[in-house]
Amino acid sequence: MKSRTTILGLSAAIFTVLSFYSVSPSVAADVPPLEERAAWFRHDRFGLFVHWGVYSTIGRGEWVQDTGKIPLAEYIKLYPKFNPEDFDAAEWVALAKSAGQKYIVITTKHHDGFCMFDSKLSDYTIMHTPFGRDICKELADECRKQGLKLGFYYSIMDWHHPDYTPVRPWEKGKRSTKGADFARYCKYMKGQVRELMSNYGPIVALWFDGGWEHKSDEDKKAFKDIIAVARQLQPNILVNDRAGIGGDYKTPEQRIPATGIVDKEGRPAMWEACMTMTTGHGSFAPTAWWGYDAHEKIFKPTEELLHKLIDITSKGGNFLLNVGPEPSGKIRPKETERLEAVGRWMDKYSESIYGTTASPFRLLPFFGRVTQKGKRLYVHIFDWPKDGKLVLPGLESMPAKAAVLGRPDAKLGMKRNNRDGIDEVLLMLPKEASDPIASVIALDFDTRPVVKPLVIKPAKDGKLKLPAAFVEIRAKHGQRAKPVSKDGRTCVGNWSNPNDVAVWCFTMPKAGSYRVELDARAASEAVVGQRVEISVGKSKLVAKIA
């Protein structure tokens, strides 16, 4: 009888439990191929995102001009008072370097249109503030001095420029757009990109944003022309996907793609997940702001940030972790502390991140992730098994050598098993974890290891178990759900966003009727009565948690 592969999706209203397609403009013939330009990107894996601008003086996030419905005439009164005297480029770069971050991307101009660089095309810049210094120039010089790479974020959207349209919905009828000419604005944008690509030395990435309001063929042509200028001046540059015409790499925001990202041919694509340390417990909650939010109460803990870095790397992506400096120019202590803590882990285990590729395992029966570097696998263990046993299912070759990184004297045992026709390697671990957040086991093979995909299917008694360790969390912007471990058991935790869906792919020998049991736990009674929807294909089951 033919087996059928099924996808089960589980979503909750509020439920808390523990080179893709690219349109390339005509550019100079000496632009290197993508694989050559992207070598650093695939190696470095970890970067620092900086959202900083005049909006920081209000302390309610980078969108405050819009969310606070501040008229332009009022908003522009901020920049003559912007004087970040505590800004120290050397301090910023040193912090990123100590965290193990290999590159920095800074907002040269965000949606409010204020320029953090010396642009000769506008007076609305950092040079016309009491501070009067080119932030981007100082950062570029310091990155070169300390050996980090630099990328520039640039917003297509501009709430200040008179030629940019459309205006914000709440401004309609209040702010005139008479005489506005978007084509003229594009010339302004091209001029600023030319400045950014000409005056700051080697720039590794051009990080566009805010292009979603302009999708016409005419607009796309203008954006292609702008990118062509960037490539002509910086032949090795990578351009992201946010100008609406494709790009060199994808940029999922505030989420981790469940299984990485592939191109149209099914090949691994380049991608970079950008995320904040903020959690949305501040201004205009539940949005987690990128720019400084003085009211944010909760920041992601170091453990979560490290798990995200490892998870993203194991799926073939890069992690661009954001900070939102204070108006003084200082990076907040809570962000600094977390970066320093991440750096202490990277000091010991960075070889399991830099230069690695995605995990060969589709599923793992434990709370952890795997990265690969040629004939070596790095097994990251987030929750050390109490019985000291760790199974790697589908691994068809026996490691020639195994070692606990950071503990060269630790003893490891290995045994080869075959369970239900599937090869597996059993690791017998030391009694104690080598790291409280993520221990790393290095497995060396004589040849590149081959892994047979693990297939979820019913046991001999017909029962199908879908453990949280095998879940794919498919999320949109603003992912909250994440794998967590409680008392040695992996769960889907922090499930407060109904757009986060838990998915299992499994194979059934035949169709039938099944009784569904869901194990839900929470730290409070708030979960009781919440709606849960379970879907298999077109069939749906809706229930409430009792």
Please describe what each predicted stretch is.
Residues 7-10, 441:
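Hydrophobic residues within membrane-embedded alpha helices
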Residues 9-22:
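Bacterial N-terminal signal peptides
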Residues 4-5, 15, 489:
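Intrinsically disordered/low-complexity terminal segments and short unstructured peptides
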Residues 5-7, 536:
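Intrinsically disordered, low-complexity segments enriched in glycine/proline and serine/threonine
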Residues 1-5, 96:
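Positively charged n-region of N-terminal signal peptides that target proteins for export
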Residues 29-513, 520-546:
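Mature catalytic domains of secreted/periplasmic carbohydrate-active enzymes
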Residues 23-28:
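Sec/Tat signal peptide C-region and signal peptidase I cleavage site
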